[in-house]
């Protein structure tokens, strides 16, 4: 069964609801914000043109599509792209400045695959099953990455929480 293409109103609704979070996710994958916006727009343009369509979950499809597009862009550049200077995606506006800095540092210290899993779970609000679909990994692998990341964050942030 061929997936049905989305109409313009459906694509617009998805963009309005998830465009910013998708761009933040692309920043998590190693691109600056301007490149992240370009990647997200390219994915939505393909949806509008009917060249791609979500198979199961539109949200999981979008995260997988922007992830793949960002990796393709990085590969095409064939150079190291620095993480965006503005790391607003790392923390919400809550907490003290010291706590926010500690969380940013702890997240930066995680291996890329664990940081990506944390982002999708916490900031994108995905289930582990949706994350497995986005990353094209077994559910147990995603669950392990999430658990290990939480353990590392807990160890790293425990001293900060005591102050």
Where are the language model's segments positioned?
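Acidic, proline/glycine-rich intrinsically disordered inter-domain spacer in sigma factors
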Residues: 9, 76-77, 84-108
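A short pre-motif secondary-structure segment
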Residues: 117-121
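Arg/Lys-rich amphipathic alpha helix in sigma70-family domain 2
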Residues: 64-84
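Amphipathic, Lys/Arg- and hydrophobic-enriched alpha-helical face
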Residues: 14-33, 48, 66, 107, ...
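C-terminal flanking helix
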Residues: 19, 23, 44, 111, ...
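Structural recognition of an alpha-helix C-terminal capping motif at a helix-to-coil junction
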Residues: 38-45, 49, 56-68
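A short, charge-rich alpha-helical start-of-domain segment used by transcription regulators
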Residues: 1-24, 34, 53, 115
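DNA-recognition helix of helix-turn-helix
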Residues: 67, 129, 135-160
């Amino acid at each position: 069964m061929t997936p049905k293409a989305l109409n313009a109103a459906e694509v617009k609704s998805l963009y309005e609801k998830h465009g910013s979070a998708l761009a933040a996710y692309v920043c998590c994958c190693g691109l600056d914000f301007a490149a992240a916006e370009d990647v997200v727009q390219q994915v939505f343009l393909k949806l509008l043109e009917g060249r791609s369509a979500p198979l199961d979950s539109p949200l999981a499809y979008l995260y997988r599509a922007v992830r793949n597009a960002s990796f393709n862009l990085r590969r095409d550049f064939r150079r190291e792209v620095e993480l965006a200077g503005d790391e607003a995606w790392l923390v919400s506006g809550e907490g003290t400045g010291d706590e926010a800095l500690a969380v940013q540092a702890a997240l930066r210290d995680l291996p890329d695959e664990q940081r990506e899993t944390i982002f999708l779970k916490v900031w994108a609000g995905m289930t582990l099953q949706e994350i497995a679909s986005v990353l094209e990994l077994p559910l147990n692998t995603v669950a392990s990455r999430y658990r290990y990341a939480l353990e590392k964050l807990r160890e790293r942030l425990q001293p900060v929480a005591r102050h």
